[in-house]
């Protein structure tokens, strides 16, 4: 089989390594897990869902994807707005998305509030009750693109920096997202807070264990996946991140391939033909090397039509590399000079509001930073924001008020003469459910996880709501 046939063949696969069969459905601009401030359907029958004593009133469909549907809903008692993602549950498998979501607690990751099962026509569905976030980076970027304006640099920096934090956090837990794209980056435009969503393709990668290569949305798919690698690492998320950064700067996808082979062609047009050594680094089992010799296109030329900061071009050149091991790590990306403006205490949003929380690093994040990077990543004015006890700064002590409550998003710290060294059990806690800083939303403290024995009832009301 030729190299072209090998790549095209992967576009025909219909199952993922969850064992789920992929189906083709109409996908909204916000994808299966993103949210919208307004439901997309003009008419929607309100449905009342009761689970574990909590009553949800669905308001409308806000997203459709290959694995399910997302509806906007209201918690009847509290009037809190949530998003409910409903996916078909294959009873032969545990739902990996639910198990992974239970592990996560980070300000830049959409939070899981509850989960329950429903049945319909002899099929079982898993319902994930998620934090509601009104917009996506995709829609914001498209708004600027349609207005023929670039996304302001301050927003590009904020979005990518927060995305790096979320990726660094999940990677510290061994989790690979495997579907980083603008549609999966939820955004609260009032605060510019970004939250990574849709962990339907996510997986804990184990060295020596094979994984499917047909994963990740095409325009953001790392070249090792196109070359059929089944032993890839979390660096595929870093490639996707670089593609998102380039897209925000260009106003369009950097590699707009129409199929597997065309995607590789688009990458080669920019990076040049990969060498045998680079192909071996991507997939040591790939044997066909029949590619036309094309020289790399210098990055400044790729962005020549745009007013793009030199630091951003330098950053992209260190991310979008064929050799996965040569790409910057997410935490190294955060420390890049491109983001120095965010570390300036005088920097604020264009409307004068303060920046969203950027330095409240969880213990899990800190274990991946290291003392050298910490000096760059955590400015002196933000030392009171990191989670304690800090493996980076053991001399920082938790005040008595914060010891009694772990719900504060910013730890109140003070200098202490008595050194508090982080114990091995503390620094290794990232391998289990992390003790991290919760999202600022008051509703976060109500987060619960239901069991498979949930009693759930569903009622469809006769009232039709117009949106």
Swiss-Prot record:
Its cofactor is Mg(2+). Changing residue 220 to F: Not phosphorylated or activated by zakA. Disruption phenotype: Cells grow normally in both axenic medium and with bacteria. Under starvation conditions, mutants lacking gskA aggregate more quickly and form smaller mounds than wild type, fail to form slugs and take longer than wild type to reach culmination. At culmination, mutants lacking gskA form abnormal fruiting bodies characterized by an unusually large mound-like basal disk. Prestalk B (pstB) cells are formed at the expense of prespore cells, and the proportion of gskA null cells that differentiate into spores is greatly reduced when compared to wild-type cells. The active site is at 179 (proton acceptor). Pfam families: Pkinase. Residues 1-20 have a biased composition (Basic and acidic residues). It catalyses: L-seryl-[tau protein] + ATP = O-phospho-L-seryl-[tau protein] + ADP + H(+); L-threonyl-[tau protein] + ATP = O-phospho-L-threonyl-[tau protein] + ADP + H(+). GO terms for cellular component: centrosome; cytoplasm; mitotic spindle; nucleus. InterPro entries: GSK-3, Kinase-like_dom_sf, Prot_kinase_dom, Protein_kinase_ATP_BS, Ser/Thr_kinase_AS, STKc_GSK3. This is Glycogen synthase kinase-3. The gene is gskA.
């Amino acid at each position: 089989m030729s190299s072209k046939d090998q790549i095209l063949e992967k576009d025909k696969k219909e199952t993922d390594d969850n064992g789920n069969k992929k189906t083709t459905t109409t996908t909204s601009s916000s994808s299966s897990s993103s949210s919208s401030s307004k439901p997309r359907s003009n008419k929607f029958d309100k449905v009342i869902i009761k689970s574990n004593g909590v009553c949800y009133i669905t308001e409308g469909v806000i997203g459709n994807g290959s694995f399910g549907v997302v509806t906007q809903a209201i918690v009847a008692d509290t009037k809190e707005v949530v998003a409910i993602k409903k996916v078909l549950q294959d009873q032969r498998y545990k739902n990996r998305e639910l198990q992974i979501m239970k592990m996560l607690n980070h300000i830049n990751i959409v939070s899981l509030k509850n989960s329950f099962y429903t049945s319909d026509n002899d099929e079982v569905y898993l319902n994930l009750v998620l934090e509601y976030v009104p917009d996506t980076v995709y829609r914001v970027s498209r708004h600027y693109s349609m207005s023929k304006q670039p996304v302001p640099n301050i927003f590009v920096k904020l979005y990518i920096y927060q995305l790096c934090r979320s990726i660094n956090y999940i990677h510290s837990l061994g989790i690979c997202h495997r579907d980083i794209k603008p549609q999966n980056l939820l955004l609260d435009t009032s605060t510019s807070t970004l939250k990574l969503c849709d962990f339907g393709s996510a997986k804990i990668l184990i060295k020596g264990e094979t994984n499917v290569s047909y994963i990740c949305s095409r325009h953001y798919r790392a070249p090792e996946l196109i070359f059929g690698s089944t032993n890839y690492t979390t660096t595929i998320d870093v490639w996707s991140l670089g593609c998102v950064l380039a897209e925000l700067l260009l106003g369009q996808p950097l590699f707009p391939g129409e199929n597997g082979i065309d995607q590789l062609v688009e990458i080669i047009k920019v990076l040049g033909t990969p060498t045998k050594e680079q192909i071996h680094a991507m997939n040591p089992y790939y044997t066909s090397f029949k590619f036309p010799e094309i020289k790399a296109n210098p990055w400044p030329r790729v962005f020549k039509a745009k007013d793009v900061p030199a630091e951003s071009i330098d950053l992209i050149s260190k991310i979008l590399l064929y050799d996965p091991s040569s790409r910057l790590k997410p935490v190294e990306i955060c420390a890049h000079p491109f983001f120095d403006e965010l570390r300036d205490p005088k920097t604020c949003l264009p409307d004068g509001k303060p920046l969203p929380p950027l330095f409240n690093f969880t213990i899990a994040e800190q274990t991946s930073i290291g003392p050298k990077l910490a000096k760059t990543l955590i400015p002196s004015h933000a030392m009171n924001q990191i989670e304690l006890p800090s493996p980076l700064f053991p001399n920082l002590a938790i005040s008595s008020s914060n010891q009694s409550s772990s719900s504060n998003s910013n730890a109140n710290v003070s200098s202490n003469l008595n050194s508090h060294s982080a114990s091995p059990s503390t620094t290794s806690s990232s391998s289990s459910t992390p003790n991290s800083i919760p999202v600022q939303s008051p509703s976060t403290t109500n987060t619960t996880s239901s069991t498979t024995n949930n009693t759930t009832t569903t009622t469809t009301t006769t009232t039709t709501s117009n949106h």
